[in-house]
């Protein structure tokens, strides 16, 4: 005879946690809103306003992720309770083991939804921009910046996010001086917001003929895309707009006209730039969107000084504000805020960042 009380206790625990989550996530209101959104998307003229239709589609995906999961949990707990009763009635150990396996699946699903409670910020659900900036140190630092770009692109791909490289300035010899990546998907900013800070690399440099150990720094700065209806006042007189040719390694796709755009907000010295389109007009629009987002984040940082990771703006990065150390010679990567550490350095550089990100979110950083 198998022991059923621990399984009953697990079912009860999952049911109680589901009920708490149902209330916290306002399930009833979200279910009602989902029905409204679905009805709007079924209207034949919805695509007459493409931006609104896209916004509704995105809202539907976000609502479904919560409503459908809670529905699946409720149905799953009902099914597993019936399965346990069947196992007891027939004294069937295989069915009993199946009950435990199903509970593992439900617990994992519930855990993922509970983790969403970490995303309570106003813009946690938004798309975001990630700026990577090489520190001083020449080619070694610029190579490190390009490694970070690759790492975050791999991470985003594994999470199912879409990415766009908005701007990338090549290094003098190798690597990247700076890059801006747009990350598109549910809770992109929520996932990445604790990655803002300085990343330190220690390794034997492939650019040093003597094979000596070098320490390099590059920074990451994450800020949410701001809705157009958020009122961010920008005085045109405060802007300096420069146009230039997009950089690149050559070939038929190199832009031969001055279509790349750089915008400097003079009062704050915040700079945005875009070169990913052949149209100067489109690049300017994108750079203005980034500027609006950066100014919003800048204001939020001033209002929430205790949570401020950066000082004033990205250009004033303090190289002491390190968040993570990557010591490749010793095969050790350590988060300096949470103490989370791993020796699988290649996996991290290939985008396996969740252990660090989840720990920082749970720590309330």
UniProtKB/Swiss-Prot annotation:
Recorded hits in InterPro entries, A to Z, give: PCRF, Pep_chain_release_fac_I, Pep_chain_release_fac_I_sf, PrfB
The molecular function terms in GO held by this entry are:
translation release factor activity, codon specific
Alphabetized SUPFAM superfamilies for the sequence? Release factor (SSF75620)
Pfam short name (any one):
PCRF
Q: Where in the cell is it found?
A: Cytoplasm
**Domain of life here?**
Bacteria
N5-methylglutamine modifications at: 252
What does the entry's PTM section describe? Methylated by PrmC. Methylation increases the termination efficiency of RF2.
Q: Which UniProt keywords apply?
A: Cytoplasm, Methylation, Protein biosynthesis
Q: Name one GO cellular component term.
A: cytoplasm
What is stated as this protein's family in its record?
A: Belongs to the prokaryotic/mitochondrial release factor family.
According to its UniProt entry, what is the function of this protein? Peptide chain release factor 2 directs the termination of translation in response to the peptide chain termination codons UGA and UAA.
Q: What is this protein called?
A: Peptide chain release factor 2
> What organism is listed for this UniProt entry?
Pectobacterium atrosepticum (strain SCRI 1043 / ATCC BAA-672) (Erwinia carotovora subsp. atroseptica)
Name the gene: prfB
